[in-house]
Amino acid sequence: MKENDVVLKSVTKIVVFILLTFGFYVFFAGHNNPGGGFIGGLIFSSAFILMFLAFDVNEVLKSLPIDFKKLMIIGSLISVATASVPMFFGKPFLYQTEANVTFPLLGHVHVTTVTLFELGILLTVVGVIVTVMLSISGGRS
C-alpha cells in the first residue's frame, strides 16, 4: 500500500495482537472445546493477511523471518509423524498418548499427542493460506 494511512496501520497493530492472542486461545482450547489447529490456523492467517493489507507486502515479509512454504511442509510432516508413529508400537493410526508432566515454572501439566498433531495442522493451514494469498496478490511467497 503506497498511501500513508495512519489509522489503518495503528488499528492493524492492535487487531493483529488480538487475533494472535485469540488464535493461541482457540488452538489450546481446541482439544476439549470447539477450535483447534484448523480454526487457530485460520485466525493466525487472518492476522498475517491483515498485516499484508495494511503495510507493504515486501516490508512485512522482510520483517517476518518466516518462509510460509517451509512452514506448510513442516506442519504436514509434524501431523503425519504424530499420526503414524504409534503404528510402529503396535497401536492404530492416530492413536492418542497422554502424560502428566511437571515443569519447573508451569507446574503440573496434562500433555497429549493431540496437541502436537493440532500444531502440525495449524502450521499447515497458515502456510497454505498465506502462500495462496501471496501468490494471488503477486507478492513473494
From Swiss-Prot:
Task: Give the CC-aspect GO terms.
Answer: plasma membrane
Ranges in a coiled coil: none
Membrane-spanning ranges: 10-30, 35-55, 70-90, 116-136
A Gene Ontology molecular function term of the record: antiporter activity
Primary location: membrane
**Keywords assigned by UniProt, alphabetized:** Antiport, Cell membrane, Ion transport, Membrane, Transmembrane, Transmembrane helix, Transport
Give the record's family classification.
Belongs to the CPA3 antiporters (TC 2.A.63) subunit B family.
Known partners and oligomeric status: May form a heterooligomeric complex that consists of seven subunits: mnhA2, mnhB2, mnhC2, mnhD2, mnhE2, mnhF2 and mnhG2.
Name the record gives this protein: Putative antiporter subunit mnhB2
Organism field? Staphylococcus epidermidis (strain ATCC 35984 / DSM 28319 / BCRC 17069 / CCUG 31568 / BM 3577 / RP62A)
